[in-house]
Swiss-Prot record:
Source species taxonomy: Bacteria, Pseudomonadati, Pseudomonadota, Gammaproteobacteria, Alteromonadales
Keywords of this entry: ATP-binding, Glutamine amidotransferase, GMP biosynthesis, Ligase, Nucleotide-binding, Purine biosynthesis
Domain Glutamine amidotransferase type-1: 8-207
Gene name linked to the record: guaA
This protein's pathway: Purine metabolism; GMP biosynthesis; GMP from XMP (L-Gln route): step 1/1
Quaternary structure and partners: Homodimer.
Name this protein carries in UniProt: GMP synthase [glutamine-hydrolyzing]
Key word Nucleotide-binding present: yes
Annotated GO CC locations: cytosol
Catalytic reaction(s) noted: XMP + L-glutamine + ATP + H2O = GMP + L-glutamate + AMP + diphosphate + 2 H(+)
Organism: Shewanella sp. (strain MR-4)
Pfam family, one: GMP_synt_C
GO MF, one annotated term: GMP synthase activity
Length: 525
């Protein structure tokens, strides 16, 4: 088995919104990488022993006092270095070049760079040719400052009309700087540039692939837990499902999954989870029907934050009770993933590389005295999904739209009642079913229904009815930080509305939410 961590790239984060994207791109190329804050020590870099280092972007100005710098050792480690945006500027300044503050002539958005010299980073890459025969590349810029003089030993590799050094290189030392962002899709050949850097310049082998990651995870799990028993809170979500499958492969019946049905799940979800993991895959599952317990605890509570806390607290109580019944369990498995582990490196203290302990089970009791097993803690969400496919989990389950931890508890506005949850479940199922039928489900990033605790007059036949209102919500987004409401066809919305009102006794009106984020959030609560 090839060692998936044998070749690796270290990415130093200076606070750019794109930094995690760089890491995901390097991994897509097939190379393992880690993301650390910019102020790491020489000892930490030596211990990690990367085959190459990427200095990422950031919002600061190299010209400002106390702005972040790469550790000096980066340039003495004898490995290739790629500086992106701020990373290029700090590389230039630290090695003797000059950076000037942008005054009203920064570049933001699409730009075309003209190639001035050959470079291993840009080998055989070209988007267009200028009238005088120069290679041109379509890239994405986002910078105010710019390099005004490059360090000794470097050559200018590319320019734009306003940026004389859009790319620079010192081929002898294998140092490269690009003022644009190769990691975003708007830079058309960005993946090829990153591939040149990781595979050709750094000499990494593409060992990081789903089948190898699974083999490695199973080996490590066997080594970590030995013959001990493990307990896992299985929610039916992507992360816990993939953890369950990995552990099942590694230790079989020594895994006990606890599935808590809180009464706040989607239509038939509990049944589907039990059928898939229990009947189909043969996992050992304890099914706890706790609907009444959760609804009793939520009685009379309308505040969203308080509802979240109640749902979290009751879950922990139930999980703790079930864990105590598993008297031989020595380990608790969790679906922690890499973004949970990374603290954004743009922190004011500069101490962001201190890994945060992340409990996505929501603060389990300290007296559980179980060791922690986190087989996904190196993986991004898209990698977890690919591994899930490889492990045999169904595509439509792995690529389902996000569902909040508290479930319908935050999609029923105000107080949560069984009647409201039952109506909402059915309305939401109709909306999702129609999205699939119209081939729209995968064209939106997230779609769901919200129950509004308001009654509205409606007409059915000759009679009037006075029933509840639901709102449909569908958004398009890349990163869920900002989102646009989805412009679904009117006839489609009409069809969904008609079905909900005609098929569900208790709902008299359907509205469509046309708020973007910002100013609204994606979820209503």
């Amino acid at each position: 088995m090839s060692d998936i961590h044998e070749h690796k790239i270290l990415i130093l984060d200076f606070g750019s919104q794109y930094t995690q994207l760089i890491a995901r791109r390097i991994r897509e190329i097939g190379v393992y990488c880690e993301l650390w804050a910019w102020d790491v020590t020489e000892a930490q870099i030596r211990e990690f022993a990367p085959n190459g280092i990427i200095l990422a972007g950031g919002p600061e100005s190299v010209t400002a006092d106390n702005s972040p710098r790469a550790p000096e050792y980066v340039f003495n480690a004898g490995v290739p270095v790629l500086g992106i945006c701020y990373g290029m500027q700090t590389m230039s300044e630290q090695l003797g070049g000059k950076v000037i503050q942008g005054v009203g002539e920064g570049e933001f958005g699409y730009a075309q760079i003209e190639m001035l010299a050959q470079s291993a980073l840009f080998k055989d890459i070209e988007d267009a040719v200028s009238a005088d025969g120069k290679s041109l590349l379509d890239v994405w810029m986002s910078h105010g400052d710019k390099v005004s003089a490059i360090p000794e030993g470097f050559v200018a590799v590319a320019k734009t009309d306003t940026c004389p050094f859009a790319a620079m290189s010192c081929e002898e030392k294998r140092f490269y700087g690009v003022q644009f962002h190769p990691e975003v899709t708007h830079t058309r050949q960005g993946m090829r540039m990153l591939s040149h850097f990781a595979l050709d310049i750094c000499g990494c082998a593409a060992n990081w692939k789903p089948s190898s990651i699974i083999e490695d995870a199973i080996e490590r799990l066997k080594k970590q837990v030995g013959d001990d028993e493990v307990i896992l809170g299985l929610s039916g979500g992507v992360d816990s499902s993939v953890v369950a499958m990995l552990l099942h492969r590694a230790i079989g019946k020594k895994l006990t999954c606890v599935f808590v049905d809180n009464g706040l799940l989607r239509l038939n979800e509990a049944k589907q989870v039990m059928e898939m993991f229990g009947d189909h895959f043969g996992l050992n599952i304890v099914h706890v029907d706790a609907e009444n317990r959760f609804l009793d605890a939520l009685k009379g509570e309308a505040d969203p934050e308080a509802k979240r806390k109640i749902i979290g607290r009751v879950f922990v109580e139930i999980f703790d009770e079930e864990a105590k019944k598993c008297v031989n369990a020595k380990w608790l498995a969790q679906g922690t993933i890499y973004p949970d582990v990374i603290e954004s490196a743009g922190s004011a203290t500069g101490k962001a590389h201190v890994i945060k302990s992340h409990h996505n089970v929501g603060g389990l009791p300290d007296d559980m005295e179980l060791g922690l097993v986190e087989p996904l803690r190196e993986l991004f969400k898209d990698e977890v999904r690919k591994i899930g496919l490889e492990l045999g989990l169904p595509y439509n389950m792995l690529y389902r739209h996000p569902f909040p931890g508290p479930g319908l508890g935050v999609r029923v506005l105000g107080e949560v009642k069984k009647e409201y949850c039952d109506l909402l479940r059915r309305a939401d199922a109709i909306f999702i079913e129609e999205l699939h039928k119209a081939d729209l489900y995968n064209k939106v990033s997230q779609a769901f229904t919200v129950f509004l605790p308001v009654r509205s007059v409606g007409v059915m036949g000759d009679g009037r009815k006075y029933d509840w209102v639901v709102s449909l919500r569908a958004v398009e987004t890349i990163d869920f930080m900002t989102a646009h409401w989805a412009h679904l066809p009117y006839d489609f919305l009409g069809r969904v509305s008609n079905r909900i009102i005609n098929e569900i006794d208790g709902i008299s009106r359907v509205v469509y939410d046309i708020s973007g984020k910002p100013p609204a959030t994606i979820e209503w609560e």
